[in-house]
Amino acid sequence: MLILGFGRMGKEILKECVAQNFNICGVIDPAEDLVGKDAGLVAGVKELGIKINKPKELGRVINDRKPDVAVDFSNPSACLENSEIVAKSGINMVIGTTGFKAKELETLKERILENEIGAVISPNMSIGVNVFWELVEEAVKLLKDRDYDIEIVEAHHRFKKDAPSGTALRTAEIIAKVMGKNLKELAAYGREGFHERKKGEIGIHAIRAGDIVGEHRVLLSTIGERIEITHIAHSRAAFVKGVIAAIKFIKGKKGIYSMRDVIRAGLA
């Protein structure tokens, strides 16, 4: 197994892989203060004899170590570069990177299909969030013609770079699809100025503060009452559990899958 991106999630994934005796083939990260160091020591577990390599070493690491799955929690541009090498090498992927533009995500999916590899792609690997999405979808189906306003509020730690979160955007896409619209037609990112709420719009709001791991709330409100569907991640362990399940799921498969597929396969 190959880890692409050694930030907070990358380190947590490595810890769990060590605990489950996964064979870790390599770690790739561009940070100069990490390159050359032992990945296990950096993650706070034990010395593994696996040095962190620069992205330009990815091809060599693949040729030397021959991983069967690559897990990418980097950033959109890095993920696109990584996927080109990984896909051409015939290695399956688990991709939790967020912040893709529509065209970038389309390019990524085309690359996976063209090279006939398998990939689980999800902006959130948490089992709870994927159930949250199903609950939101069902609620919107029941209420979409009953004069309910829909707002999404997400909160994360001060270090998160993309806003709104990939999870919030995916939530909005699910809602828009149920309403038979394109998200671009309905999305209202934050609010300012002096005007009433537009009928049918989906409000999307982002909070960045402290060390919040991840919170997502959907409000469905009408005159006289309100429903709230909420998911709160207490720690990154919620995401890591899903990543491990996705790694097990994607081995030997071809095509593009979501965490819903992983959950329905009984692996999460």
Which functions belong to the PLM regions below?
Residues 4, 8-65, 144-268:
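C-terminal substrate-binding/catalytic lobe of Rossmann-fold NAD(P)-dependent oxidoreductases
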Residues 25, 53, 94, 118-120:
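Structural detector of well-ordered beta-strand residues that form the stable sheet scaffold
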Residues 30, 98-100, 124-125, 155-157:
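Short, ordered loop/turn segments at secondary-structure junctions
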Residues 67, 113-122, 222-229:
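Glycine/charged-rich beta-loop-alpha catalytic/anionic-binding loops adjacent to active sites
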Residues 70-71:
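N-terminal Rossmann-like NAD(P) cofactor-binding module of classical short-chain dehydrogenase/reductase
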Residues 77-89, 96-121, 130-138:
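Rossmann-fold NAD(P)-binding glycine/threonine-rich loop
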Residues 130-147, 163:
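Rossmann-like NAD(P)H-binding beta-loop-alpha module
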